[in-house]
């Protein structure tokens, strides 16, 4: 069943029309849902407590905030990168 659906989607793609393929890919993608203020606040509090989550803690945070574990994992990855960037900018500013 799943395989037949995948074949149907492939049939919709037209190698001679990359723009149509791009539009099709964009329309089938999951809509971006920003986090609520409450979710962001709770994720930030958790991040201040610990920059890295165990699998069990990630499951708990996701359950409490009504997010997927993947969303929590990626939020933490992005937050660590943001912190790394902020620290780099701070040290660059201090050195100049």
Swiss-Prot record:
It is found in: Nucleus. It comes from the Eukaryota. SMART domains: HOX. Keywords: Developmental protein, DNA-binding, Homeobox, Nucleus, Transcription, Transcription regulation. SUPFAM superfamilies: Homeodomain-like. PANTHER family: AGAP004664-PA (PTHR45970), HOMEOBOX PROTEIN HOX-C9 (PTHR45970:SF1). Sequence-specific transcription factor which is part of a developmental regulatory system that provides cells with specific positional identities on the anterior-posterior axis. Belongs to the Abd-B homeobox family. This is Homeobox protein Hox-C9. The gene is HOXC9.
